């Protein structure tokens, strides 16, 4: 595990910059060696999301929610992002290691204009204590397997039952989020009634705006 006090070139999903000012957030990277399939990356990301939420609930009176697949929100504001990348073996085709990046705003007071809908945890807890709690919960979850946390993940989802849109290969599609499968995939019902499961890390899920009459 590597922890930084600041990131000068923090990176989020799809190459976006991750704002990481000195001394105000948690910037940690965990490397997990396991030899899993690439599609299991989504389950590792969901495990990290649960670890962050459990740590927040353990150390504060906040009530976090998870926006599939990699963001943690409090009061509809993003306070944490998670990025998982794989190191793939050339011969095996397996993910020999998963690199889990966790960035959480602890006491960040100001955000640049391009950082939308962000907020800080703003709780009376040290970064060191929060990092230790996240790491403890993450190792416990990874040791115990999917069954130990998937119900928790579902109960903390901020999307289930809501109308959403997802973007895949540049195409925006309306759907309804109806479930989380056993390894963390988002199950959605399309407008034609068909049901699919989203797994790709390049999918962006946004609550669909509804017009007021």
Regions found by a protein language model. Give the residues of each.
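N-terminal lobe of the biotin/lipoate ligase/transferase fold
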Residues: 1-58, 78-80, 88, 196, ...
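General beta-strand structural signal in soluble alpha/beta enzymes
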Residues: 4, 64-68
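Long, positively charged amphipathic alpha-helical accessory segments at protein N-termini or as interdomain linkers
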Residues: 46-64, 74-213
């Amino acid at each position: 595990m590597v922890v930084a006090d600041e990131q000068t070139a923090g990176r989020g999903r799809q190459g976006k910059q991750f704002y990481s000012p000195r001394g105000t957030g948690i910037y940690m990277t965990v490397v997990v060696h396991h030899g899993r399939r690439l599609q299991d990356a989504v389950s590792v990301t969901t495990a990290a999301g649960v670890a962050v939420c459990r740590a927040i609930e353990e150390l504060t009176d906040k009530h976090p929610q998870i926006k599939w697949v990699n963001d943690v929100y409090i009061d509809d504001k993003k306070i944490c992002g998670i990025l998982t990348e794989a190191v793939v073996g050339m011969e095996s085709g397996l993910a020999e290691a998963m690199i889990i990046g966790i960035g959480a705003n602890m006491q960040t007071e100001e955000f640049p204009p391009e950082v939308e809908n962000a907020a800080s945890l703003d709780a009376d807890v040290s970064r060191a204590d929060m990092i230790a709690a996240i790491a403890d919960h993450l190792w416990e979850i990874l040791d115990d397997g999917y069954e130990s946390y998937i119900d928790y993940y579902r109960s903390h989802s901020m999307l289930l039952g809501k109308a959403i849109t997802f973007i895949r290969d540049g195409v925006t599609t309306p759907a309804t989020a109806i479930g989380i499968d056993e390894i963390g995939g988002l199950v959605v019902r399309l407008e034609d009634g068909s049901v699919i499961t989203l797994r790709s890390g390049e999918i962006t899920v946004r609550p669909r705006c509804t017009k007021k009459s």
